[in-house]
Regions:
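Cofactor-binding loop segments of dinucleotide-utilizing enzymes, especially the Rossmann-like FAD-
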Residues: 44, 124, 150, 182
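A structural signal for isolated positions on well-ordered beta-strands in alpha/beta enzyme cores
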Residues: 40, 146, 176-178
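Amphipathic alpha-helical segments in well-structured domains
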Residues: 70, 106-109, 135, 160-164
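Conserved G1/Walker A P-loop phosphate-binding module
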Residues: 1-99, 140
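Catalytic P-loop NTPase motifs of RecA-like helicase/translocase cores
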Residues: 98-99, 129, 155
Length: 194
């Protein structure tokens, strides 16, 4: 790819039209050479994207808000895992996709996918039309995709299995699906014993 990119001869008009894509390609090539992996965490507002990243890095680095989503801009966080094949893994927190219109959502999905090596699409229930729309855009970009059903601790095991099957049945093609509880609910014992 590096050789192909170096040999690519484009006119100034073509450079103008393809400038953004070429910069993305150059960044991807640089990350490949430096053995860096970029994982985007994508989904609707309030599904627990930041909580999932906090759970993966094992510390509460990203702000989370119970009332509503709190991520306003993309933010990359290093994932402290060790691997002989990789020098660095970044987890990228993204704003909620349902805070923008359909056209903007499609552009954001494409931009996030093209700038990543893997996309985690996080949901906290069955797939909504917004999830499906984003999923189709992400799949069209050709990047590996993993769907994560977050907050899986909200359902008894049998209901969770049925929900996971419902999600799999609605996917446009074979996409891996996993359940997670990034910030599991913990029972609190009240002074009155309840």
């Amino acid at each position: 790819l590096q050789t192909w990119r170096q040999m690519l001869k484009l006119s100034s008009r073509e450079h103008g039209l393809l400038g953004g894509e070429l910069r993305l390609l150059d960044r991807q090539l640089q990350r490949l050479q430096q053995k860096e992996l970029r994982i985007a965490v994508f989904g609707r507002v309030g599904v627990g994207k930041s909580s999932l990243i906090n759970a993966l890095i094992n510390r509460p680095l990203l702000c989370t808000d119970v009332a509503h989503g709190s991520t306003r801009i993309q933010e990359a966080v290093p994932w402290p895992i060790t691997s002989s094949e990789l020098n660095r893994v970044d987890l990228v927190d993204t704003p909620g996709i349902d805070e923008i219109g359909a056209d903007g959502r499609a552009r954001l999905a494409a931009r996030v996918a093209m700038g990543s090596d893997l996309v985690l699409l996080v949901v906290d229930s069955d797939l909504t039309s917004t999830d499906l729309e984003a999923l189709k855009t992400l799949l069209a970009c050709g990047k590996p995709l993993q769907l994560v059903l977050n907050r899986s601790d909200r359902w008894p095991e049998q209901e969770q299995s049925a929900l996971l099957q419902s999600i799999r049945d609605r996917l446009p093609r074979d996409v891996p699906v996993t359940a997670a509880a990034a910030a599991p609910r913990r029972p609190v014992l009240q002074p009155d014993g309840s």
